């Protein structure tokens, strides 16, 4: 995917396609550098420009169910293989976990990299940001065997119908990434990489990822976390 860039950013992404005006963009999206940050813009105006600032996540409680899925792994290496907007990774880092993030989409990776760099310079967020490492890679190909204690997956789930309740950031994520169709390969790679467990975030109504039954699941208010245990793990159902 070609990344369209409008404006003179200090550290432009490699191989960015520079454009002079929005209509020059190759595709529906472009990044606009202004006011010292990137804005994700939609040429079809389906949503306003979106930015990412990890400081906005400070003070938000977030899900308390997700950290429970990583119980006993406070000091272990964890991978977030589908980083997206980084909200879940930030929540876990704020609870003391250390994570390596993987994001293959160039737009989301650029937004994440800029936001993480800014968070590292902000005294309010630096300690949390220090627990996050970002990779621009497809986790289905990049995850090495037995490289993490746990791998977290939040793959895009195709919406059954459009809803006004879907947040703008999620709308953009759906339009940018869509449903990749390689869920089976991603889950298989994650299970090879995890020495303890794989956690898959799913809507309550959704079937298991790639129709592969988990060992057990943990329910949140609107979300289900399916847990796949690694062979010979000390973890129990």
Where are these predicted regions, by residue range?
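Hydrophobic alpha-helical segments and helix pairs
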Residues: 62, 68-109
